[in-house]
């Protein structure tokens, strides 16, 4: 059990331009995905993760704190942005949650907001 004066950050789906090639973002980026799912994910860029850590560390916030972009994005929509909207949909995915969107209200209450939206980044072919 964590001490009462501790904080734990619960990150959603973290990504970056050099994300692992065997994760969905990397598979789509590298045009190696063979399917998509009907899941929705709260994609947070690693730069926003670092920003969240810097914001939260000096505060007195305790307990578990969800950290994400705060937006639920369908995996299929991300595939479309990567030009792979025609991939087959894998329906049966045991052990996967349908949606992992984070309630980022605690982070926003200390002045933090995420700034890198995955759909804008992919659409603009940017590497923040």
Predicted feature residues:
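Amphipathic alpha-helical segment in the mid-to-C-terminal domain
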Residues: 21, 46, 75, 114-118
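NAD(P)-dependent short-chain dehydrogenase/reductase
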Residues: 1-42, 46-47
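Short, amphipathic alpha-helical "lid/cap" segments that border enzyme active or binding sites
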Residues: 24, 46-54, 119-123
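Amphipathic terminal alpha-helices
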Residues: 105, 117-128
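Glycine-rich Rossmann NAD(P)(H)-binding loop
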Residues: 14-17, 34-40, 65-73, 94-96, ...
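Generic structural signal for alpha-helix termini and adjacent loop/cap motifs
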Residues: 30, 56-59, 110, 128
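Mid/C-terminal beta-alpha module of Rossmann-like enzyme folds, strongest
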Residues: 50-52, 58-98, 103-104
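Short aromatic/basic micro-patch
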Residues: 8, 43, 72, 101-102, ...
